[in-house]
């Protein structure tokens, strides 16, 4: 159980450092999720993970006793690259120190996209030799964990059919590793069971959870805290440090040649009645999350055609071979899918539709293909999509925050036989109402990709459309 105590000024100040002036929410002694104000005389459950960092004074020692040993006799360490071994060495040294100083054995592995967090975590799982729960945000990530866990030769159970089905299964069967989706944690009985019978908890893609919200995961970490806990992420959420406060971050030296290709095109103005109606919502509360910006962008036929022509040309000439085209809306996704199918057929073009239960099988089939165009949404492909062979990313949407951008670009930052990785951006629109918004969001993508992820920006290229010359010569001037 987390520590239930009053929060003095020093600890309150320490916790607020992670919140960027946002309010601090914790469970009070009555187990209600409430805002914590300074100098409060009330008691709150303080997540033990915050004490994993030696900069935070302990309220009381944390004695970690792990009794749930793995049962597989032939547990095997998976092979690691030298940099992954360095992470393991740092983590194990830190964990020994935590054990000896009576601090919780909690650590965030802040490692870049493509580093191999999954295999590194599985190695640590074998190091601890304790039964483990691996928690993922959605079913899409289960396949890559299954493949990594199999390398350890530990017994495992994958739960995709709901927590009630899993609980029935656990009555007659046990396993060293449980792979679950996070919504299982809404079941209190299940939370207590894994707290009692499993010692290690691995939270994949931890940035996808805001632990300042009253969620199933927040409750689990507060009332059923694991004995050993790892958060895995390439883009850590600062507020989550309150639940897992120690971080290991090893910079990856990559041999990848990462280029950012910006395709400029100066269009004639384009509009339709549909666009004009949607444009009326741009400066209203209805566009709070820029949904109408994306809806209008999906209707930008000249820009859409430019994207299709650019990708088709590069694909035909073999300049790109394994391409992912990413949009925000399903309507936009099906538009591009249909266009590319017209050009190349279904032997080369695939749809990453989150609503299609067969999509995971499609993704698995792409691992063996030499050439393909995969069209999907940022929601489906932004986090956890595991196709290491991807060599090109085509970003068709606009509205992405820095975390989403980094996760999306991470799809083409994986080490593979292709060392050349290309990201395509299309910063122009034929629709004047969203011209400045598109430019603003594109600059954000450029900034994250070049300043943070090491992409090299190529000279801007494209076509400049001159209306007068177009009419005179019936041709486009490059």
From Swiss-Prot:
CDD domains: SF2_C. A motif (DESH box) lies at residues 204-207. One of its GO terms (molecular function) is hydrolase activity. InterPro entries: Helicase/UvrB_N, Helicase_ATP-bd, Helicase_C-like, P-loop_NTPase. Residues 302-454 form the Helicase C-terminal domain. SUPFAM superfamilies: P-loop containing nucleoside triphosphate hydrolases (SSF52540). Keywords: ATP-binding, DNA-binding, Helicase, Hydrolase, Late protein, Nucleotide-binding, Transcription, Virion. Residues 456-478 are annotated as: Disordered. GO terms for cellular component: virion component. ATP binds at residues 111-118. PROSITE patterns: HELICASE_ATP_BIND_1, HELICASE_CTER. Residues 98-254 form the Helicase ATP-binding domain. Its EC number is 3.6.4.-. Belongs to the helicase family. Poxviruses subfamily. This is Transcript termination protein A18.
């Amino acid at each position: 159980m987390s520590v239930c105590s009053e929060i003095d000024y020093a600890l309150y100040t320490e916790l607020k450092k992670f919140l960027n002036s946002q309010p601090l929410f914790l469970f009070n002694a009555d187990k209600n999720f409430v805002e914590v104000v300074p100098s409060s005389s009330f008691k709150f459950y303080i997540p033990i993970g915050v004490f994993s960092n030696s900069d935070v004074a302990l309220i009381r020692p944390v004695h970690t006793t792990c009794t749930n040993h793995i049962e597989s006799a032939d547990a095997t360490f998976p092979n690691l690259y030298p940099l992954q071994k360095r992470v393991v060495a740092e983590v194990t040294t830190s964990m020994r120190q935590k054990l000896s100083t009576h601090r919780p054995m909690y650590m965030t592995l802040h490692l870049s996209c493509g580093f191999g967090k999954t295999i590194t975590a599985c190695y640590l799982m074998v190091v601890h030799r304790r039964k483990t729960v691996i928690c993922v945000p959605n079913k899409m990530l289960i396949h890559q964990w299954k493949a990594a866990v199999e390398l350890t030769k530990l017994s495992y159970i994958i739960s995709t059919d709901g927590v009630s089905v899993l609980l029935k299964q656990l009555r007659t069967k046990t396993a060293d590793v449980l792979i679950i989706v996070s919504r299982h944690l809404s079941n209190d009985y299940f939370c207590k069971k894994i707290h009692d019978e499993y010692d290690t908890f691995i939270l994949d893609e931890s940035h996808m959870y805001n632990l300042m919200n009253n969620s199933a995961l927040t409750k689990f970490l507060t009332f059923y805290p694991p004995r050993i806990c790892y958060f895995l992420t390439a883009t850590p959420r600062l507020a989550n440090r309150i639940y897992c406060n120690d971080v290991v971050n090893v910079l990856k030296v990559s041999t990848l040649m990462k280029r950012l290709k910006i395709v400029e095109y100066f269009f004639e103005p384009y509009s339709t009645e549909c666009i004009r109606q949607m444009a009326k919502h741009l400066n209203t509360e209805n566009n709070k999350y820029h949904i109408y910006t994306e809806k209008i962008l999906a209707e930008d036929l000249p820009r859409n055609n430019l994207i299709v022509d650019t990708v088709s040309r590069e694909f035909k000439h073999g300049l790109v071979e394994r391409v992912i085209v990413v949009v925000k809306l399903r309507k936009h996704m099906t538009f591009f899918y249909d266009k590319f199918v017209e050009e190349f057929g279904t032997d080369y073009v695939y749809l990453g539709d989150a609503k299609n239960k067969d999509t995971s099988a499609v993704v698995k089939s792409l691992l063996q293909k030499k050439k393909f165009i995969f069209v999907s949404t940022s929601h489906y492909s932004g986090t956890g999509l595991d196709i290491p062979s991807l060599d090109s990313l085509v970003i068709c949407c606009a509205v992405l925050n820095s975390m989403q951008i980094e996760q999306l670009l991470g799809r083409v930052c994986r080490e593979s036989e292709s060392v050349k990785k290309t990201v395509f951006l299309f910063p122009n629109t034929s629709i004047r109402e969203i011209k400045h918004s598109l430019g603003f969001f594109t600059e954000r993508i450029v900034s994250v990709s070049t300043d943070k992820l090491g992409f090299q920006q190529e000279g801007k290229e494209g076509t400049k459309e001159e209306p007068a010359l177009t009419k005179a010569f019936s041709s486009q001037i490059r």
